[in-house]
């Protein structure tokens, strides 16, 4: 589902992705606060699908903000093989691993997932796990609650 929000003019490019972290103190008195923050869920990764041309003033973003249309971003993560079923809806839990230097660590412990997601596809590439975990790389879409 597409949502309307505001984002810094320098960041407002179709195709860009961001993780919404919530409002800042500086946002409190702003007249645009509701459109900036009320449509987005904290911790969710969004993709910009369209950008409007008008620029609006902002105390946080030096060059102002633009109105953008966003939707939850589809992205790739790694999960345990037994959970990797196309079309299934899951509540995210990171792969149990503390090897922060592993090349797969960020995919096994992704940012920008809050709550549930749907497995849109299982990717064919093989995932090597140094701890011996059976893992799969998948594409997911967050489920809006």
From Swiss-Prot:
Name of this chain's protein: UPF0179 protein MmarC6_0993
The lineage, from the top, is: Archaea, Methanobacteriati, Methanobacteriota, Methanomada group, Methanococci
Say which domain of life the source belongs to. Answer: Archaea
Spell out the Pfam families in the cross-references.
UPF0179
Record family assignment: Belongs to the UPF0179 family.
Span of the secretion signal?
none
In terms of HAMAP family, this protein maps to: UPF0179
Q: Which organism is it from?
A: Methanococcus maripaludis (strain C6 / ATCC BAA-1332)
